[in-house]
From Swiss-Prot:
Enzyme Commission (EC) number: 3.5.99.6
The UniProt record lists the keyword Hydrolase: yes
Superkingdom, natural source: Bacteria
Pathway the protein acts in: Amino-sugar metabolism; N-acetylneuraminate degradation; D-fructose 6-phosphate from N-acetylneuraminate: step 5/5
Any one of the GO BP annotations: carbohydrate metabolic process
Pfam families given in the database record: Glucosamine_iso (PF01182)
Keywords in alphabetical order: Carbohydrate metabolism, Hydrolase
Name used for this protein in its record: Glucosamine-6-phosphate deaminase
Record organism: Clostridium botulinum (strain Eklund 17B / Type B)
Function according to Swiss-Prot or TrEMBL: Catalyzes the reversible isomerization-deamination of glucosamine 6-phosphate (GlcN6P) to form fructose 6-phosphate (Fru6P) and ammonium ion.
Example of a GO MF term: glucosamine-6-phosphate deaminase activity
InterPro entries according to UniProt: Glc/Gal-6P_isomerase (IPR006148), Glucosamine6P_isomerase (IPR004547), NagB/RpiA_transferase-like (IPR037171)
Active site location: 67 (proton acceptor), 136 (for ring-opening step), 138 (proton acceptor), 143 (for ring-opening step)
Amino acid sequence: MKILVCENYDKLSEKAAQIIMSQITLKSNSILGLATGSTPIGMYKKLVEMYENKMIDFSDVKTFNLDEYQNLPISNDQSYHYFMDDNLFNYINVKRENIYIPNGMANDIENECIKYDNLIKEAGGIDIQVLGIGNNAHIGFNEPTVNFEKKTYVVELEESTKIANARFFNSLDEVPSKAITMGIGSIFESKKIMLLATGENKAKAIYDTIYGKVTPEVPASILQFHDDLIVILDKEAASLLNPKDYKVV
């Protein structure tokens, strides 16, 4: 595990984007695992800037997103399809046929989950998976008490997660109650994982993830066992960590 602490959110976003750029420079047909939520938005902006400055080429890249709400049309501005278009895909040269996001509108949702894992496998596996982390240390929509071996599956969202996401909707009632998410088992198969966190409200989750007992009660704690994990934090998210355990960048 490698832990980097940045001065602020902008520096964190820049560092994360540089790591993605390095991955694509080394392997032009990289398979990227992407996340939604507020944390990676700055990274996506930096990647768009890099593309506009001809520093990065996405034409051979494939992307797989972590999750999508169930029964929320992709045209809805709160769907993760919409989010990814609005924050990244509409502004870079990634091919539409190389973008994969779970289909939350699928008639056979269980089959959609199996199909999604198979698509990742057929692509050769994810080279680098971007993750955010919830206040309760969830990753993707893998909530506390999750089975660590689970592949992509349908999850009932915890009330705390719905409340956290309600800020993106007009009301709590509009937040979908279910989502398709890559399971911990699917995420863990990624060759490299990059976990991003900002703000004091994430400090406890980060502390438990790095120092705590590995337990389904803290879903992100399983990342302690991953062979190639990089954690990028701002000062606030790192506030509970021992300074000897991280590098300031």
